[in-house]
Amino acid sequence: MTTKRIDRDLPSSDDPSSAKRRIEFPEETLENDGAAAIKLLSLLLQCAEYVATDHLREASTLLSEISEICSPFGSSPERVVAYFAQALQTRVISSYLSGACSPLSEKPLTVVQSQKIFSALQTYNSVSPLIKFSHFTANQAIFQALDGEDSVHIIDLDVMQGLQWPALFHILASRPRKLRSIRITGFGSSSDLLASTGRRLADFASSLNLPFEFHPIEGIIGNLIDPSQLATRQGEAVVVHWMQHRLYDVTGNNLETLEILRRLKPNLITVVEQELSYDDGGSFLGRFVEALHYYSALFDALGDGLGEESGERFTVEQIVLGTEIRNIVAHGGGRRKRMKWKEELSRVGFRPVSLRGNPATQAGLLLGMLPWNGYTLVEENGTLRLGWKDLSLLTASAWKSQPFD
């Protein structure tokens, strides 16, 4: 992917390790919109510098200027700048109020919020391969891990509407050796929405003559007071699915989550994570710059397939991408340190399971069948990475419990 640099001198007080950051964006994205895009991005970075150094009056002035020249309905650079500017504005207001605006991740979602997010994710699934890749790759790994098993228990740490599981039901139902039972334990924020998801999955399983049970748990795994709520049974193969995102907190207490997984000793954990490596407890500017680069690629990818007038595009950008940007920029910070999950899973007794071979081949075939160009698939050290013009967006990996020596 050809990129173009935008250089800004960033204050060393915020990030002592680097007095200057070089920010690179897809050259075609910038060239299509010319000097206007470069000016917008430069203004946004200047505003981020002001916020990082608590020059809030200057930041507010610059945000007013930015709001006059960019729109969430314009070009891809305009749109991404508009959402990052909104997030900076939220952070500025929070700073004026002495932190009165608490992180969204600490607030349970209302039913209405959940429904809006789930609906927007369904739309995203119809206009982009990212969610399809997540579901398909994890399902292939799970199917392989369940070879020879006839009693299955899947623990989905964020089941949402359960969109992933009908495809797995299909391939499990096609096996010569029929399942004696398949259970899904699904975590979620609303008992009503969980019940609705359970009914849909039960109806689908029934249509395939699969013996199915759904076990809803309202809440998040890291806050589980009694791990026996997971209700594992003797002789069943246990799989944990963990799709990470930044729409809301999925796991709660990181250390408790790891301890529960360690004690659970599942046959397999499938993890799909965004390729954002910043540390929430570190530099604000570091978090801002990496997020700006990452989400610029996502906006560019959507813009490549959908026009500026597309209602689907606006829905995804506003409810999915805009919410994640706000959580990273306006609410992210030192309250909670992001784990490096690869290292942490290894530390508590898990080893990676390679996704090369059939999962990689099947993922490549899926990507080739979809109508979107510009996406790339790379197998690296047994993981699968989906990218946009060579910038990694999602990484899928699988893990297996192993005893300590």
Swiss-Prot record:
The keyword Lipid metabolism does not apply. Residues 1-20 are annotated as: Disordered. Expressed in seedlings, cotyledons, shoot apex, leaves and flowers. Residues 38-102 are annotated as: Leucine repeat I (LRI). GO terms for molecular function: DNA-binding transcription factor activity; transcription cis-regulatory region binding. Residues 330-400 are annotated as: SAW. Signal peptide: none annotated. Residues 31-400 form the GRAS domain. Residues 121-186 are annotated as: VHIID. GO terms for cellular component: nucleus. A motif (LxCxE motif) lies at residues 45-49. The keyword Transcription regulation applies. It holds the Pfam family GRAS. Keywords: Nucleus, Transcription, Transcription regulation. Its main location: nucleus. GO terms for biological process: bundle sheath cell fate specification; endodermal cell fate specification; leaf development; regulation of DNA-templated transcription. Residues 196-228 are annotated as: Leucine repeat II (LRII). It comes from the Eukaryota. Belongs to the GRAS family. Probable transcription factor involved in plant development. This is Scarecrow-like protein 23.
